[in-house]
Curated annotation (Swiss-Prot):
Function as written in the Swiss-Prot or TrEMBL entry: Activation of anaerobic ribonucleoside-triphosphate reductase under anaerobic conditions by generation of an organic free radical, using S-adenosylmethionine and reduced flavodoxin as cosubstrates to produce 5'-deoxy-adenosine.
Matching PANTHER family: ANAEROBIC RIBONUCLEOSIDE-TRIPHOSPHATE REDUCTASE-ACTIVATING PROTEIN, PYRUVATE FORMATE-LYASE-ACTIVATING ENZYME
Keywords attached to this entry: 4Fe-4S, Iron, Iron-sulfur, Metal-binding, Oxidoreductase, S-adenosyl-L-methionine
UniProt EC number: 1.97.1.-
Protein's UniProt name: Anaerobic ribonucleoside-triphosphate reductase-activating protein
């Protein structure tokens, strides 16, 4: 898996101050996408143990509320194994931090993924530039916010 960039403290991609990992690789190629440079899975840098150490260093700070995974698409097929390993490791190492994940896939098509038990919030659905929204943390009105409470997923 490759990644485009890491924000050590971001207030846009979820609540509070968050560490944000932008992965590369996306099949959706949404018209009007803000992160077109992340579509090609070969772009960016290789995700390595040093990347995990960098994320851990940022996540260890008390003012960090959690980790946000975006891109690209964290659930791009070639990213799934690495993302699964990452979210399980983050939950074990930093159980007090929440994990938010943005994906172009609909929740109904990914709900069977084992890794989702480690994720607290999913924003699902492709970005649709013709469906503007005022909903917090969504790029378009079709996108839904799914919350995981004790293994039960509900959307707004």
């Amino acid at each position: 898996m490759n990644y485009d960039r890491i924000y050590p403290c971001d207030f846009v991609n979820g609540p509070g101050c968050r560490v944000v990992l932008f992965v590369t690789g996306c099949l959706h190629k949404c018209e009007g996408c803000y992160n077109r440079s992340t579509w090609n899975a070969r772009n960016g840098q290789l995700f390595t143990m040093n990347t995990v150490k960098e994320l851990a260093s940022h996540l260890s700070k008390s003012y960090i509320q959690g980790l946000t995974l975006t891109g690209g698409d964290p659930l791009y097929p070639q990213n799934r194994e690495e993302i699964s390993n990452l979210v399980s490791w983050v939950k074990a190492r930093f159980p007090e931090k929440d994990i938010w994940l943005w994906t172009g896939y609909k929740f109904e098509d990914i709900k069977q993924l084992e890794m989702l038990k480690y994720v607290d919030v999913i924003i699902d659905g492709k970005y649709e530039k013709n469906l503007p929204t005022k909903k917090l943390w969504r790029g378009s009105d079709n996108q839904r916010l799914w919350s995981n409470t004790d293994g039960v997923w509900k959307h707004d």
